[in-house]
Amino acid sequence: MAPLHESLSSINDVIESKPLFVPITKPILQPNSFNLSEGSLCAKDSTPILFDVPQNVTFTPFSSHSISTDAPLPILLRVQANAHKGGFLGFTKESPSDRLTNSLGRFEDREFLSLFRFKMWWSTAWIGKSGSDLQAETQWVMLKIPEIDSYVAIIPTIEGAFRASLTPGEKGNVLICAESGSTKVKESSFKSIAYIHICDNPYNLMKEAFSALRVHMNTFKLLEEKKLPKIVDKFGWCTWDACYLTVDPATIWTGVKEFEDGGVCPKFVIIDDGWQSINFDGDELDKDAENLVLGGEQMTARLTSFKECKKFRNYKGGSFITSDASHFNPLKPKMLIYKATERIQAIILRRKLVKESGEQDLTELDEKIKILSEELNAMFDEVEKEESLGSDDVSGSGMAAFTKDLRLRFKSLDDIYVWHALCGAWNGVRPETMMDLKAKVAPFELSPSLGATMADLAVDKVVEAGIGLVHPSKAHEFYDSMHSYLASVGVTGAKIDVFQTLESLAEEHGGRVELAKAYYDGLTESMIKNFNGTDVIASMQQCNEFFFLATKQISIGRVGDDFWWQDPYGDPQGVYWLQGVHMIHCSYNSIWMGQMIQPDWDMFQSDHVCAEYHAASRAICGGPVYLSDHLGKASHNFDLIKKLAFFDGTIPRCVHYALPTRDSLFKNPLFDKESILKIFNFNKFGGVIGTFNCQGAGWSPEEHRFKGYKECYTTVSGTVHVSDIEWDQNPEAAGSQVTYTGDYLVYKQQSEEILFMNSKSEAMKITLEPSAFDLLSFVPVTELVSSGVRFAPLGLINMFNCVGTVQDMKVTGDNSIRVDVKGEGRFMAYSSSAPVKCYLNDKEAEFKWEEETGKLSFFVPWVEESGGISHLSFTF
C-alpha cells in the first residue's frame, strides 16, 4: 500500500503512457484544510472547529494514509482533488478495552445537523448548537461554519475490529465511542476512527466525504458504482400491512387482482413475513407455527427450513387460474387482524392488572381470552378448508406452482420478492434443523450505547430468546442455499430485515465487525449468483456498520422507520403526526444513505387519512412506489393511485433522490412551530420541490421516544424559490447549466396556478395547514428564435410528478416544438401564443388555450402499442 498521492501519481503515469487516453495532470499536493495545534482543531488556518481537544487525540491528513482500493479511476481522481479537505481523528488510551470512549474536543454556539439511532435498526435527524446536544449513537454530525461560508462533517468510522459512533459529553464535549462487540477483542489506539471533511456546499460535503471513505476503507461502494434493481421504476404491493402474518396464496392473488380491476396492476409484489417455515423452541421440528396474525407473535420463532410453510406448500398448481380465487373472502385478513387485536388487548390488560394491582380473580377476563382464542382458531380452520379447494387438474404444487400461476394470470407482474431476516427468521434458525451450518443459539447482548434508544418490542423479543446463529464460516452456504431455492421456485428478490442483530451476537466470533464481514460477504455473493446482483431491499439497517460493510452490492434500502398508520402507544393524534415523522426520517437519512444506496421511502396505504400526503412524497422521492393496502374494494383509492402510477405499472420517477433544501438542513420541521419541510428533486426537463407541514411531534430525549406535541400541530408558513433546487447536484437536468439565467415556469399542484420565476425573483410565500403539502414544479422556458414564442411543458397534470411524464422535448424548426409524454390524462404547457396547429400522434388535435394565463391543454389517451407514450407537436 502507498499514500494516496503516490498511488494516484503512478496511475497517472500509466495513463500518460497510453495515447488512447487524454493525459491527466499529476496531483499537486495542497496544504490540508485542518490543523490540530495547542488543543484546537482549526479549519482554513484559524477558524476553530473543536476546542479543548485532549492531548491523546491525533489528526492526520487524508493524503498521508495508505490505500489499497478497487475504486474506479473517476472516483479516485475526485478523491485526490479533494484530499486536502479532510483527514482522520484518532486517540490512544493507556489500557486496551473492547469499548473505549474519548472526547474529540468541544463545540458550542454552532448549528449542527446530525443523524442518530433512535432504535437499534432506525436513524433520524437531530439538531442543536453544542456537543452536549448530540444524542447517543450519532452516525455523523454536520457543523455550519458561517464565518468561512463552509460546512464540516465529522463521521465516525470503522477501524480494524472496532466500529464508532458519537455521543454527547458535558460542557459541549463531543465523545467518540469505539466498540468491538466482544470482550475478547480489545484495542487501545486508533489512527482513523473518525473522518472530518470541509466544503462550502453541504451536499458536496457528504459526497466528497463518503467518496473519501469509500477509497480509504474499500469495504463498500457508492451508489454511482452500482446498478439499481428493476423495481425502482415501478409500482408494487407489499403484503405486510395488508394482512400481516396471515398472508397466503389466496390473499396475494386477490390483492393483485383488485389492483388490476382498479386499472393499475403492480409490477412487483413483496410477500412479507408469514410465508416461511418457522416454529418455536420446544415445537416438533417439522411442524410449522400456526395461526399467527400480528407482528410480534413470530419474533421468538426460528427458521426450520428454507422452503415455504404449509399455507404455501399446499397450493395446487392451476387452482386459481380458472376460479381467480373467487372463493376467497377479501375481508378475511382484516377480520383475523381485528380478532387477534381484540385478543392481544385482553392479554395486555390482564398483565397490567396483575402487575399494577396484583389482582388475583381474573376469571372473567381469562374466560374472555379463552373465547377469543377459540374464535380465532375457528376462523383459521375455515380458512384452511377454503385453501383445500382447488383444481383437479393439478400442475405442480407449492411456491413454484403459485408464482408460475401468478405470472401466467397477471402478465404485467415482473418481480416477486419475499421477506426474510438477516439471520433467517426473527430469532434466526433452529439449530437442530441446520446442523450442517453449525448453527447455535447465541445470547443477544445489547451494547450500552443503545441504552438511550426507544423501547422496542422487537429488541425485547430477540433478547428474550437469543438468536439461532449460523456459524460465520457457513454464511456463504447459508445464503446461497436459501436464495438458490427461492430463485428455483420463481422468486426474483428479497426484502431483508433485522440487519443490526449481528452487532449483539459477536462475543464468540471476533467482534461485530468481523462477524458482519463474514455475513455480508456471503450475502453479496448470493445476490450476484441468485438475484441478478441487485434485487435485494435492505431494511432495519440504518447503522453506519451496514453502510460501511454491506453495500458493495446492495443498491437500495429503506431510509425511514415503518409506515405507522396509527400510534402503537395509543395517541389518537398519532394517525396524523406519525406521518410527518416519517417524512423527516426519509428526507434527512437520504443525505448520507443516498451516497451508497437508492433511498426507499417505504409503503403506505392509499385509504389512509394522510394518504395524499404520503403519495406526494413518494411521487418525487426518486425511488419505487408501493402500497400495503388491505384487501377489499373500499381499501383502495384508485383516483390517488393513478396520480402515482401509469396503467402499465411503471411510474414517472424523478432522476435523482429527494433531499432537504439547504434552508431546511438546520431547522426542526417537527416541533419548532415555524418550519416547513422542503425537499427537492429533478426530472429530465426540470426540478420539483415538495413542501410538507410535519409539525406536531418529535423525539423526546428525556423519554427516549417519539411523542406528539399538540401545541405544535399548527399552520406554518415559509418561502419557496427556484434556487432552493440545488441544480448542480444533477447537471443533466434541463436548466441546470450554470449559464442558464432564464425564466422558469412554476406550477403549483394543489391550485394549478402557474407563474414565472428566475434567480433574481423574490421568493414566493407558502402557507400549509397541519398535515398538508404542496408540490411545485419548475420548468425552464424555451423561446423560439423566429417567432419569439415562449414555451414550457408541464406534462400530464393529473399526475403528482407531472413533469416526470415528459419523456422528451425538442425544437424541431423555427416555429415548431415536439414533446413526448407518457400516460393518459390532461396535458398542460405554457405557451405565450396559441399554436397554429397541434398534433397528437400525427393527427391534428383540438386544444384549449387561455390568453390570460397562457395555459395550453388537451386530453392525451393511453397508447398501448407505444408503451403509453404519445407524440405531441406544436406549430406556431
Curated annotation (Swiss-Prot):
EC number of the protein: 2.4.1.82
Pfam families, per the entry: Raffinose_syn
SUPFAM superfamilies, sorted: (Trans)glycosidases (SSF51445)
Keyword set, alphabetical order: Carbohydrate metabolism, Glycosyltransferase, Phosphoprotein, Transferase
GO BP, sorted A to Z: response to oxidative stress
Enzyme class of the recorded protein, top EC level: transferase
An annotated Gene Ontology molecular function: galactinol-raffinose galactosyltransferase activity
Catalytic activity reported: alpha-D-galactosyl-(1->3)-1D-myo-inositol + sucrose = raffinose + myo-inositol
Modified sites of kind Phosphoserine: 7, 9
Function: Transglycosidase operating by a ping-pong reaction mechanism. Involved in the synthesis of raffinose, a major soluble carbohydrate in seeds, roots and tubers.
Family from the record: Belongs to the glycosyl hydrolases 36 family.
Name by which UniProt lists this protein: Probable galactinol--sucrose galactosyltransferase 4
